[in-house]
């Protein structure tokens, strides 16, 4: 769920940033600044706001996924072949039609690249969410194994996490 929401919100944000120079000037510095905040620091806050349930885990995954998708897709949108844009201008294509028919299709490989990165990070976000406040799940199992010095259980949980990430 976090992967899907992060991909949709990241894609829409990238389109909005590419379409509006004002949004680009205002929002892009905040996006870059947000990456300076360690994700681990957000986990307790999200747990306080959203509770110990699934919501905080989804929010953590969404936050981790959002930036790679937004960044990759935005970069691809801005690198659309200038010849294609010039041809569209000559043909009288303007505004959102240029975005919809030329820029977005040309930038889909960049979106896919960001999504591939995000798919690797999604389980990490969920695990971080479980570390803060869960009574079950892989993150909880890892904390339990760590607290009881059970390295075999810790490595087993890490292997399951790695396999799960590769499957995504």
Question: Can you describe what each PLM-predicted range is?
Answer:
Residues 2-31, 48:
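Transmembrane-helix boundary motif in ABC transporter permease subunits
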Residues 17-22, 46, 50-52, 64, ...:
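Short helix-capping/hinge motifs at transmembrane helix termini and TM-loop junctions
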Residues 21, 78, 109, 156-168:
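C-terminal transmembrane helix and the adjacent membrane-cytosol boundary/short C-terminal tail
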Residues 59, 63, 95-129, 156, ...:
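Transmembrane alpha-helices
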């Amino acid at each position: 769920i976090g992967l899907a929401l992060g991909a949709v919100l990241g894609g829409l944000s990238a389109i909005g940033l590419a379409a509006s120079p004002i949004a680009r000037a205002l929002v892009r510095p905040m996006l870059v600044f947000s990456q300076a905040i360690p994700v681990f620091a957000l986990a307790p806050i999200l747990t306080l706001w959203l509770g110990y349930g699934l919501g905080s885990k989804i929010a953590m995954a969404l936050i981790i996924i959002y930036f790679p998708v937004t960044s990759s897709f935005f970069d691809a949108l801005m690198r659309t072949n200038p010849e294609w844009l010039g041809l569209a201008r000559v043909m009288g294509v303007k505004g959102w039609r240029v975005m919809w028919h030329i820029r977005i299709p040309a930038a889909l490989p960049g979106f896919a690249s960001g999504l591939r990165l995000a798919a690797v990070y999604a389980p990490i976000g969920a695990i971080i969410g479980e570390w803060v406040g869960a009574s079950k799940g892989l993150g909880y199992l890892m904390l339990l194994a760590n607290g009881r010095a059970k390295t075999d259980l810790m490595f087993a949980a890490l292997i399951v996490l790695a396999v799960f990430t590769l499957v995504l």
